[in-house]
UniProtKB/Swiss-Prot annotation:
Belongs to the histone H2A family. The keyword Lyase does not apply. The gene is HTA3. Variant histone H2A which replaces conventional H2A in a subset of nucleosomes, preferentially in transcriptionally active chromatin. Nucleosomes wrap and compact DNA into chromatin, limiting DNA accessibility to the cellular machineries which require DNA as a template. Histones thereby play a central role in transcription regulation, DNA repair, DNA replication and chromosomal stability. DNA accessibility is regulated via a complex set of post-translational modifications of histones, also called histone code, and nucleosome remodeling. Essential for vegetative growth. The modification N6-acetyllysine is found at residues 5, 8, 11, 14, 17, 22. One of its GO terms (molecular function) is structural constituent of chromatin. This is Histone H2A.Z.
Length: 146
């Protein structure tokens, strides 16, 4: 039995607790593995709840959906942060979110929701502005006195 696989001790055998703890890995979330902040497991659960009982949801579908949601959220927050800096405040309000979304052409098409407390985008139609330009007003003022 010297040098064989039988018996106790030695290297590589099936003996007791030797080497068993080394193979244990700490559990890693799917969000951590994908390098995301959004919860992949929760999104997978929501996706499974949305499809019918016959259909299945692949594991990578949840990762892909979480990545898309995280990217869009980061994009909106970056634009809203820029809007809050323009107003010289440190807190992002619903108004800043609305200005960020409506100011970006692609996000405006994507997000059609009404944001509570966001207000409206100021816009005056060209037909309502009047036909007088700055040149006409200055020449009209100089021509008036008689």
């Amino acid at each position: 039995m010297a040098g064989g696989k039988g018996g106790k001790g030695g290297k590589g055998g099936k003996g007791g607790k030797v080497g068993g703890a080394k193979n244990k890995k700490t559990p890693q979330s799917r969000s951590y593995k994908a390098g995301l902040q959004f919860p992949v497991g929760r999104i997978h659960r929501f996706l499974k709840g949305r499809v019918s009982a016959k259909n299945r949801v692949g594991a990578t579908a949840a990762v892909y959906a979480a990545a898309i949601l995280e990217y869009l959220t980061a994009e909106v927050l970056e634009l809203a942060g820029n809007a809050s800096k323009d107003f010289k405040v440190r807190r992002i309000t619903p108004r800043h979110l609305l200005l960020a979304i409506r100011g970006d052409e692609e996000l405006d098409i994507l997000i059609k929701a009404t944001i509570a407390g966001g207000g409206v985008i100021p816009h005056i139609h060209k037909a309502l502005l009047g036909k007088h330009s700055t040149k006409n007003r200055s020449s009209a003022k100089t021509a008036e006195p008689r």
